[in-house]
Curated annotation (Swiss-Prot):
Annotated segments matching region Disordered: 157-207
Taxonomic source organism: Gallus gallus (Chicken)
InterPro entries: HD (IPR001356), HD_metazoa (IPR020479), Homeobox_CS (IPR017970), Homeobox_TF (IPR050848), Homeodomain-like_sf (IPR009057), HTH_motif (IPR000047)
Pfam families: Homeodomain
Compartments, record wording: Nucleus
Gene: BARX1
Role description: Transcription factor, which is involved in craniofacial development, in odontogenic region definition, and in stomach organogenesis. Binds to a regulatory module of the NCAM promoter.
Chain intervals with Basic and acidic residues compositional bias: 183-207
Protein name: Homeobox protein BarH-like 1
Length: 207
């Protein structure tokens, strides 16, 4: 009567042998934590810093050591991408040249000044640029283009108007030629009173 089949135990004995000890409770906690970790949704490895850090670490390498290389790689990759994207932009900026758009008032001022003066000296160009709110280079470029257009019109129309020279350069008439000098000398000689043939000269009177 005292013999019990294997696997059967009394209530008190079962409580003693089946009661979980501290070791068993620790294992249960670890299993619960592992289950919670695996149930937690992970982002794709290629899209998250954690995944790339895990890939960089690899088996046999600690996580922090592998993750220390991650910022450097990302930094280098970012610099390369920025340099690659910046080169075409810089080339495009160098290739493009902005065209100056003049206002109606500026064009009117330039045209009026061009009618009076086809060539501008440096002081005149500075004054005109400041009065119209333009740079000297813009005024100079506009004048060059306008003169070319004006010369074509003059040549095609057979006009008698000739291009005037700038104020800074000496005009052709301001420098006397050799013929003009000889004419001036002749004019001076004619101003002297002519000697009459009947009157003796000063040398003859002295003799």
């Amino acid at each position: 009567a005292n013999e019990r089949p294997p696997g059967s135990c009394s209530s008190s004995g079962c409580r003693r042998c089946c009661r979980p000890g501290p070791y068993h409770s620790h294992l249960a906690v670890l299993k619960a934590e592992q289950a919670a970790v695996f149930k937690f949704p992970l982002a794709p490895l290629g899209c998250s810093g954690l995944g790339s850090a895990l890939l960089a670490a690899g088996p046999g390498m600690p996580g922090p050591a592998g993750a220390s290389h991650l910022p450097l790689e990302l930094q280098l990759r970012g610099k390369l991408e920025a340099a690659g994207s910046g080169e075409p932009g810089s080339k495009a900026k160098k290739g493009r040249r902005s065209r100056t758009v003049f206002t109606e008032l500026q064009l009117m001022g330039l045209e009026k000044r061009f009618e009076k003066q086809k060539y501008l000296s440096t002081p005149d160009r500075i004054d005109l640029a400041e009065s119209l709110g333009l740079s000297q280079l813009q005024v100079k470029t506009w004048y060059q283009n306008r003169r070319m257009k004006w010369k074509k019109i003059v040549l095609q129309g057979g006009g008698l108007e000739s291009p005037t020279k700038p104020k800074g350069r000496p005009k052709k008439n301001s420098i006397p030629s050799s013929e003009q000098l000889s004419e001036q000398e002749r004019a001076k000689e004619t101003e002297k009173p002519p000697e009459s043939p009947g009157e003796p000269s000063e040398r003859q009177q002295e003799e």
